[in-house]
Curated annotation (Swiss-Prot):
Nucleotide-binding protein. GO terms for molecular function: nucleotide binding. It comes from Legionella pneumophila (strain Corby). Belongs to the YajQ family. This is Nucleotide-binding protein LPC_0632. It comes from the Bacteria. InterPro entries: DUF520, UPF0234-like_C, UPF0234_N, YajQ-like_sf.
Length: 161
């Protein structure tokens, strides 16, 4: 039976490159001259630090632009609502999710079942396996999921006949 897996993975190399390019741009921008502004990456967590709330928001926008240039989706990112102020700096933390958590996996399965597609779904850890009798049914399911409003960036792998 044909099958494929739905996963949510973050390309760590592209994330590192987006951080490096954003840091490089911060060092050359006029509005960040004489200001201590940093962007750091550690274990899929990006920390933005600057001297004012407004500059942290500018760093966030700058970083999101560099992510979009590298085709990294920032839709599945856990981000603090307000920058945290401690001492001289404001800090904003963005955590990129890796894998599909249980509630989101159940939401994906429910969405596929509501569409009445001729496929079966099963949750396997941090991925969702979809099997069907025909390859066309699986491709139709992928098209439906791309149109859905699930907040995680989804990838489709292990497509087997």
């Amino acid at each position: 039976m044909p099958s494929f897996d739905i996963v949510s993975k973050m390309n760590e190399v592209d994330l590192r490159n987006a951080v490096d390019n954003a840091v490089r741009e911060v060092s050359t921008r006029f509005d960040f001259r004489g200001v201590e502004a940093t962007i750091e990456l550690k274990d899929l967590t990006v920390t933005l630090r600057s001297e004012s709330d407004f500059q942290v928001r500018q760093l966030e926008d700058l970083f999101r632009n560099h992510c979009s240039k590298r085709n990294l989706s920032t839709s599945g990112v856990d981000i603090e609502d307000e920058p945290v102020h401690s001492g001289k700096f404001y800090t904003l933390t963005m955590t990129f999710k890796q894998g599909i958590d249980q509630p989101t996996a159940k939401e994906i399965v429910k969405y596929i079942k509501e569409t009445k597609a001729k496929v079966q779904t099963s949750i396997q850890g941090d991925k969702v396996r979809v099997t069907g009798k025909k390859r066309d049914d699986l491709q139709e399911t992928i098209a439906l999921l791309k149109k859905s409003n699930i907040e995680l960036p989804l990838q489709y792998e292990n497509f087997r006949d």
